[in-house]
Amino acid sequence: MKQQIQLRRREVDETADLPAELPPLLRRLYASRGVRSAQELERSVKGMLPWQQLSGVEKAVEILYNAFREGTRIIVVGDFDADGATSTALSVLAMRSLGCSNIDYLVPNRFEDGYGLSPEVVDQAHARGAQLIVTVDNGISSHAGVEHARSLGIPVIVTDHHLPGDTLPAAEAIINPNLRDCNFPSKSLAGVGVAFYLMLALRTFLRDQGWFDERNIAIPNLAELLDLVALGTVADVVPLDANNRILTWQGMSRIRAGKCRPGIKALLEVANRDAQKLAASDLGFALGPRLNAAGRLDDMSVGVALLLCDNIGEARVLANELDALNQTRKEIEQGMQIEALTLCEKLERSRDTLPGGLAMYHPEWHQGVVGILASRIKERFHRPVIAFAPAGDGTLKGSGRSIQGLHMRDALERLDTLYPGMMLKFGGHAMAAGLSLEEDKFKLFQQRFGELVTEWLDPSLLQGEVVSDGPLSPAEMTMEVAQLLRDAGPWGQMFPEPLFDGHFRLLQQRLVGERHLKVMVEPVGGGPLLDGIAFNVDTALWPDNGVREVQLAYKLDINEFRGNRSLQIIIDNIWPI
């Protein structure tokens, strides 16, 4: 199946009230991304939403305060992705700095324990002497685990950002901006953001109770942990709304200034990234995957240990271990992609077209990599995808990724209502979800999922498209504008990096590496000569020496090599004219 990609230009909100002193290009870019006022461009900590609007915080901090006073053993239970790892490390570091000495953490193993606070994970925490469990980036659907903890006399504080179901676990306190009765304006906090807000509230409560004065403890500067917040927020691909942009920008600023955890510094080194020139995309595409590799292939306790360690030498050893795991992950993923594309071809041949929603399974797929695989196939065919791998007990674990127009968790909830028992469990967000089912139910699920997507999704949404910010004038194709755009972020999910389009003469073209197209182009109407590169092109189509003019969708970029800086364009899409 050849996915046709259409170009659409982003609409600009002409009613946005943005500062007149902003360059016209930035005003256009911000207005087309839903920014309506200067307040939404605030990047200082003063602009952060107050923690007081998070429901459940007051009860949670009282429980934690009493635990601190009584020396209660606290176990932080995290998750096996980058958000879970940063949430766990942040919570442990923050509570230690606040004066808690009896604290430990536990991260479930993806392959042995599965996701969340299960009864088995509670037993592990109990074996470690847990007297209070605090979940981070999980717990909102852990009814059985919370009940089991209560039966053992262990209270639970749930901090999470995943969407809640119709009923909530019977925890002593629940903090989640997506609770129905929570008035926190941002529903897009990552798990690490929720954990950070709880620690801010706890610090205030402890200060008001005289905790620090009684013990002659300096009140900690929790802003020192914003590097972890930035990494977890970007890596979890939550929308970068105004509040998340503040958290991310502040964390990135600390990393750029060299004021970050040794583990983050070591990850930057193995990823060959310059901290001083850090972009949000480096967190998402360089650091995040290496941290995630621990949870995907091995055990995320390695990742948490990296983020907790204070010694750069130890951090470098752990970062190299994660880098090697990430390389293995890439190799596994490459093989799985080939198999997935073969499955798509067979499916298309059997019915002349691909279904609106793809559910895929291969008995040799790796359950730690199916989420990435679903993302890759979704990007290729522009439709919701759920990829499954065997869980080893007659069940399958699936990871889904969606497109705009289909809320993945809502779709799974509807399937669960229509076909009770088809799935064992599920959870997630609008754009990503996880589920498990018995292996003999896969064919039924594949059929029902495809039917539901066809029913719910407008067929036009299955047409892949590139959304552009329109053309740049030749005068805007400069290093100064490229730097302006770099500094105008952070860019990310739901606040995309500026992408422009234009008509160019194709002056030179050649392959570099195996699949990257290096070009030199010139605007058809006149303008500067531009070096450009398009990654992972279809080598059956490019290079094509018969093509003289092209339409490009591209990003302005600064190429830095051996101390030299030059303007280049990163080409997302290229169409011959």
Swiss-Prot record:
<dbReference type="InterPro" id="IPR038763">
    <property type="entry name" value="DHH_sf"/>
</dbReference>
<protein>
    <recommendedName>
        <fullName>Single-stranded-DNA-specific exonuclease RecJ</fullName>
        <ecNumber>3.1.-.-</ecNumber>
    </recommendedName>
</protein>
<dbReference type="GO" id="GO:0006281">
    <property type="term" value="P:DNA repair"/>
</dbReference>
<dbReference type="Pfam" id="PF17768">
    <property type="entry name" value="RecJ_OB"/>
</dbReference>
<comment type="similarity">
    <text>Belongs to the RecJ family.</text>
</comment>
<dbReference type="Pfam" id="PF01368">
    <property type="entry name" value="DHH"/>
</dbReference>
<dbReference type="InterPro" id="IPR041122">
    <property type="entry name" value="RecJ_OB"/>
</dbReference>
<dbReference type="Pfam" id="PF02272">
    <property type="entry name" value="DHHA1"/>
</dbReference>
<dbReference type="InterPro" id="IPR004610">
    <property type="entry name" value="RecJ"/>
</dbReference>
<comment type="function">
    <text>Single-stranded-DNA-specific exonuclease. Required for many types of recombinational events, although the stringency of the requirement for RecJ appears to vary with the type of recombinational event monitored and the other recombination gene products which are available.</text>
</comment>
<keyword id="KW-0378">Hydrolase</keyword>
<dbReference type="GO" id="GO:0006310">
    <property type="term" value="P:DNA recombination"/>
</dbReference>
<keyword id="KW-0540">Nuclease</keyword>
<dbReference type="InterPro" id="IPR051673">
    <property type="entry name" value="SSDNA_exonuclease_RecJ"/>
</dbReference>
<keyword id="KW-0269">Exonuclease</keyword>
<dbReference type="GO" id="GO:0045145">
    <property type="term" value="F:single-stranded DNA 5'-3' DNA exonuclease activity"/>
</dbReference>
<dbReference type="InterPro" id="IPR003156">
    <property type="entry name" value="DHHA1_dom"/>
</dbReference>
<dbReference type="InterPro" id="IPR001667">
    <property type="entry name" value="DDH_dom"/>
</dbReference>
<dbReference type="GO" id="GO:0010165">
    <property type="term" value="P:response to X-ray"/>
</dbReference>
<dbReference type="GO" id="GO:0003676">
    <property type="term" value="F:nucleic acid binding"/>
</dbReference>
